[in-house]
Amino acid sequence: ILFEGNEITQDDVLRREMRQFEGAWASDDKIEQSRVRLERLGFFKEVNVETVPVPGTDDQIDIKFRVEEETTGNVGGNLGYSDFGLMVGFNLQERNFLGTGNSVGIAINKSIYQEVYNLSFYDPYYTIDGASRGYSLYYRATDYGEFNIANYTSDSQGLGIQFGYPISDTQRIGLNLTYDKTDIDAGTLPVRDILDFLIEEGNSFSTVSAQ
């Protein structure tokens, strides 16, 4: 099995999608299934396949997959204005990081009252049999004084871990685990209700969830 046209994407990324195996009896159905799986990756504009007889033999063939790669990265930004001031944002997503088939994402959003940072990573083949694993991190700082609600701030951090396992060519089961932690700072002149709440409940809150 040969691959042509994948200048960025590594051969291993294509080979793990094969349902026709080298050294096995050739099957038109498995060859076509392999081609369709390459298309589903979303890394290629076009995927073609041909079978070529091996010179000097009458019972062997080479299978050649020709791919045309397409852009897998996206860069975006946003700019807005509300009653609370200017809002700006930036995001970067690469679905085929360094040709590994892994996905990496970064997002930053800032305004006068809030800053949010997100980072994500996803490996669709964490194990050889197609189990996937992903991570996501975030940090959010909010100044509620800018809302004219109350003069306090909060800092939140979170970690997410995602696992997936294929149960068919088109279906997967998954498990998402998340941990969130929020710290509240009442400031130098806190509102009495907020101060009473923090004295009773504390100023740090953590949650763990699974779904």
Question: What label would you give each PLM region?
Answer:
Residues 2, 15, 32-35:
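Generic structural signal for individual residues within well-ordered alpha-helical segments
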Residues 8, 24-211:
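Gram-negative/organellar outer-membrane beta-barrel architecture
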Residues 8-22:
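N-terminal periplasmic "start-of-domain" segments of outer-membrane beta-barrel proteins
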